[in-house]
């Protein structure tokens, strides 16, 4: 018989009760409100990014497992967990596809709006990990010239496919996808510093859908660019109003918030906890998942970029997120910022979308390369 256990779970973790209830008693609480008292009888703690997991929270509790359903790690004191034999699992890569789709969707939208062709542009990816690799794959499918900057990978792989940061900053479009670190040889805090941003030219496009603080925001404000796409902010939920006003697209750290990314994070932590307690996973929770979106039908224009834009507009529209935060004045209202993130509208990732095959085999192959199902 399975011993009685208690799990305290951030109530923003999707499908928490459906996934975890067979493992024990599930207590769902707002992540920012979880405190030591709530954990007195808890065996496991499952969080997103709003709970600071450290000695102040866990000391004098019986928590033996901490799971984070998001990829960021700066809310978890990992040395403390290790020193106290508390197992930690983070759902690394769970939202990588969602973030890559956010970046590519915005680039396609910009190309249509500003009347340029993506296949004629160069894209530098700063940080080629879970997200960067998927951005690379999608950008190459669209015919872009892709340049890669990732010093740790360059050293480890001894590969000449990577370039240094100064050369990467010469690209038409620059997107950052590193973790946020403040120490070590490859620290990324203010990686794009005042000196680096002085190299940026007015025709370039700059994107941050990684972590706030990788780009020095005060320097960014004084950097003339063609366009800025910003999802991550240095002091969020305090959004820099000057930078916000310079952004073509400004969103409240939701690039990784596609429903499928959240589900993946929940499931990854669930399976890790099952392994920790040596319990067989139960897949019956899947019956609660929503059905796939309706099929997408398309009338081709003959221009692949325009046709891809028409498909993507039926999947997710970042301009609607931008309009929502501007209409609600989220830039100066912390509660609205958090509310929008917690009540984020559902959208699905491209692999969940079915597109009816078109008469153009080349375009069908492009859709397949981007991850769509063809029917």
From Swiss-Prot:
EC code(s) of this entry: 1.1.1.290
The name this protein goes by in its record: Erythronate-4-phosphate dehydrogenase
Active site positions, chain numbering: 211, 236, 253
Reaction equations catalysed: 4-phospho-D-erythronate + NAD(+) = (R)-3-hydroxy-2-oxo-4-phosphooxybutanoate + NADH + H(+)
Organism: Hydrogenovibrio crunogenus (strain DSM 25203 / XCL-2)
CDD domains on file: ErythrP_dh (cd12158)
A single GO molecular function term of this UniProt record: 4-phosphoerythronate dehydrogenase activity
Function: Catalyzes the oxidation of erythronate-4-phosphate to 3-hydroxy-2-oxo-4-phosphonooxybutanoate.
Broad class of where this protein is predominantly found: cytoplasm
Segments passing through the bilayer: none
Quaternary structure annotation from Swiss-Prot or TrEMBL: Homodimer.
Binding-site residues for NAD(+), renumbered to this chain: 150, 178, 231, 256
């Amino acid at each position: 018989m399975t011993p009685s256990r208690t799990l305290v779970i951030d109530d923003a973790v999707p499908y928490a009760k459906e996934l975890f209830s067979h493992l024990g008693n599930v207590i769902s609480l707002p992540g920012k409100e979880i405190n030591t008292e709530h954990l007195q009888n808890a065996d496991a703690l499952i969080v997103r990014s709003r709970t600071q997991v450290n000695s102040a929270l866990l000391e004098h509790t019986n928590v033996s497992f901490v799971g984070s359903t998001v990829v960021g790690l700066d809310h978890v004191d990992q040395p403390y967990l290790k020193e106290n034999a508390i197992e930690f699992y983070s759902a690394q890569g769970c939202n990588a596809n969602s973030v890559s789709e956010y970046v590519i969707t915005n680039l396609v939208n910009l190309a249509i709006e500003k009347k340029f062709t993506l296949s004629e542009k160069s894209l530098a990816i700063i940080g080629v990990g879970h997200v960067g690799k998927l951005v690379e794959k999608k950008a190459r499918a669209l015919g872009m010239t892709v340049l890669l900057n990732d010093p740790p990978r360059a050293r480890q792989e001894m590969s000449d496919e990577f370039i240094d940061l100064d050369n990467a900053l010469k690209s038409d479009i620059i997107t950052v996808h590193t973790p946020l670190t403040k120490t070590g040889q490859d620290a990324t805090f203010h990686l794009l510093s005042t000196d680096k941003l002085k190299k940026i030219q007015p025709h370039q496009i700059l994107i941050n859908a990684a972590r706030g603080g990788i780009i020095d925001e005060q320097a960014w404000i004084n950097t003339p660019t063609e366009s800025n796409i910003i999802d991550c902010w240095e002091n969020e939920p305090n959004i820099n109003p000057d930078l916000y006003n310079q952004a073509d697209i400004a969103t409240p750290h939701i690039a990784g918030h596609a429903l499928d990314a959240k589900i993946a994070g929940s499931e990854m932590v669930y399976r890790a906890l099952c392994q920790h307690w040596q319990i067989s996973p139960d897949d019956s929770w899947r019956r609660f998942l929503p059905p796939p979106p309706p099929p997408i039908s398309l009338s081709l224009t003959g221009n692949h970029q325009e046709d891809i834009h028409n498909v993507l507009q039926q999947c997710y529209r970042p301009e609607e997120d931008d309009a929502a935060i501007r209409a609600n004045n989220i830039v100066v209202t912390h509660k609205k910022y958090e509310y929008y993130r917690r009540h984020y509208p559902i959208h699905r990732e491209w692999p969940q979308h079915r597109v009816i095959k078109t008469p153009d085999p080349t375009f069908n192959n492009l859709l397949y390369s981007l991850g769509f199902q063809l029917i």
